[in-house]
Curated annotation (Swiss-Prot):
Belongs to the villin/gelsolin family. It comes from the Eukaryota. This is Villin-like protein quail. Residues 823-888 form the HP domain. Signal peptide: none annotated. Required for the formation of cytoplasmic actin filament bundles in nurse cells, possibly by regulating both the polymerization and organization of actin filaments. Mutations in quail result in female sterility due to the disruption of cytoplasmic transport from the nurse cells into the oocyte late in oogenesis. Germline specific in adult flies. Gelsolin-like repeats lie at residues 307-366. One of its GO terms (biological process) is actin filament severing. One of its GO terms (molecular function) is actin binding. It comes from Drosophila melanogaster (Fruit fly). Transmembrane segments: none annotated. Keywords: Actin capping, Actin-binding, Developmental protein, Differentiation, Oogenesis.
Amino acid sequence: MELSLSPKETEIRPNTIPDLKVDATFRKVAKHAITFAIWKIDEDRLEAVQRSHYGTFYDSCAYIIYAASLSGHYANHETITREQKPNVSLERYIHYWLGKNVSEQNRSNVVHKIQELDSYLGNISSIYRETQNLESARFLSYFKKGYDVRSGALISAPQRPRLFQLYARKWLRSIEVATIDWSHFNSDYVMVLQTDNLTYVWIGRSSSGIERRSALDWVQKHCSGSPITIVDDGYEQAMSQEHKELWNTMLPLKKRMVCQASQLVSEYADYNSNKFRIYKCNQRGRLHLDQLDVGMPAKDDLSDAHGVYLLDNYGQSIWLWVGGQAPQADALSAMGNGRAFVKKKKYPDNTLVVRVLEGHEPVEFKRLFANWLNVWQENTRGHKPVSTKFGKLDAHSLCERPKMAADTQLVDDGRGERVIYRVFGDQVQEVPISKTVVFTTNASFVVKYSVQCATVVPADLASVGIKTIIYQWNGSEASVESISRADKFAKASFDGLKEPGMFVQLYEFDEPPHFLQIFEGKLIIRRGQRTEMPYNGNSNALLDTFLLKVYGDASYNAKAVEETHLSSISSKDCYVIKTNHVWVWCGQSSTGDAREMAKAVGALMGENSLVLEGKESKEFWQSVAMYFNQTLVINGNGNSCSSSTSSSSGAGSMCNGSSNGGNISPTLSNNCYLNTSVPSKPRPPVQLFLVWWQQSSLRYEEILGFDQQDLSSDCTYILDTGSLTYVWLGSQAPNQERYTAIAQSYVQNAPFGRRSATALAVVRQFQEPNVFKGFFESWQNDYGKNFHSYEKMRKDLGNKVTSNCCFASEGSALILNNRQKDFDGHKKYPLTVLIQEMDMLPPDINPLKREVHLTHDDFVSVFNMSFYEFDELPKWKKMELKKQFKLF
């Protein structure tokens, strides 16, 4: 596919700028310093914004934000400027923000000014084009407590009355609207109406608890000294007569029309899309975009350092990557070409456009590429323990040092008690205790593990955080029935715990380090459709003949997996072959640690013999002829389909698994072993997302530069560590029972490389394990115990707040029954709309259920009773009343 863009379609044309002089205001910025600065462009004026006004914008202006931080760190509005040595690597970001009502002159001016700033800073900054209400996660991270957008049309108007929209979960946006009208109301929002003598806080019925809490905080900060009255969506008539009369002078209740939350869905459509297209930009008289024939983007697709590539996230965001050897003119014109692409594709005008430069790509860009390995080199956290042997010192260190536990993903040293259950079909069978643990690929296994902390110090015990882990392991050939039964059994075990615990759901191929550690790196995975455990009841020895490939070189990353056929053998591999004798074969390029792990697996089967490549006896070749052949062994790297078992990989690729049959699990294809444990490369930087359900779809906001204070008790979060996806459940979060659905939906829709078989972990607030806490700076175990819900905040406001009938006189919440909640969930219309002829009704109204679209106030006014009372009436009576009031 090819697109062609003419010069007239671009927003930025460098050749029209005769002389790129740098504004004197920009020259005050230290070039090699950690810093944060904001400038405002109002017509022809560029002025620096005072620090006290950071986070306040006018919708008629354009703004420029510059943020510089150490690599891997994040700047924000509180960052203090600090000079750095020339050899210190900095990340630089330039954002230009356009208000909803910004003039074309301001748009043009800001485009020129960012080129000046970029040039002054050495043309190495990433540039983001931001628009009001659709800002990037990085922009939002600069303002931890949210930001305010004031109306430029009201600059010269009286201070009161004013109307504000307050919404967004993590970063509260307060938007001042130019007119006071019902058209600005939405059931998703909290609305604030400020008058000279009173502040109304209108609570949209679809707003979340965290939005309501943030809104009350905002009101108390911005409306101090003014009496506050809280008005609930649909219950406006319950205001006192005095307050209602004042309200009606500005927002007549007879004209009430509030948009339903569902009308905002278009704003979020495909918000979590993980689909991408890559175009190569070519200048052939005019700009041509040649689409590359790729699926999931790979770093190798950006192969031309002299060129420019465009990454299209189907209208959600447009990224321009400029090669390190591309002409300067291409770097300058990249943003304009991105804007022209948006217009050509008829994407929304507020689509995010970002320009990045080779060697200076932000992490948000790098993670879009599943195989961008060198992106993680700057990550300060490795995932390989310092030692491959765990003595008392190491075990104790894991207990007292959460960061070490998080880096290694080891809760303890794996010496605690374990109980194993095998789930096959609908049968759950406890596995006899044995040093030899064998899993089969056609079944699921549930492991209940008791955490063992090598200390009695209370602080260290609190640091570990949990006492039990429930692991659910699903084989690659396990049926849907087996996985479903294991899922129910594991969840019931987790939900029934009497002590702090963690639930981990994982698949073959994705075993995390601690899971392998509890088996001391000697877990055996057998293939084939076995319905019984392959044990001899008397000797507890493995029966029949088989071939095991041993992956890994340490107890936390090793396991042995059965292979049924070999096409080649690498000299880096180790195998255990069970025939009439047990043989441990080690390639000449295998490491000493890998050989030790192979010998440990062989020892489980009894007397064994170590065989080194090149020193095989005739007896060996005769014994293993059905599996091994000298012609298969390829010296050195060879062409083995398995990856090297290098000192820290612990994973390879097994290309000869038995075929899946029947109804099998939706995991990664069983013919590829990838990333089974601790990788040779550092893990990706950890990501934190606030997640919630909206109309059966999972939505999420990324929180860059996170800390523990970003976790709210009434929310659910995803912590993505790369190898394990944690679901953190706040103590008062809704939908807690859907924790696995949350994680699975996230993995399937994340806009970067993830497999559906990624391991998932569930942790609850105040029961966080050390492997989770260690990803946060200065974790406080008691943080959040003084959390105040919206209902409690509303109650605690006491005499400061005058509430309508939703709350009793003493401020306690009126508990609505489920029928009343269902009633409040419907879109509301004025009575005049609902009594129209059927063909005149809005399309989302069921003519037989018109009454549910009345507000509570209108319902009581019409029927002289609440909906709950109405719903208790006999069917004939309800029908008679609806006919009487023309609602049928």
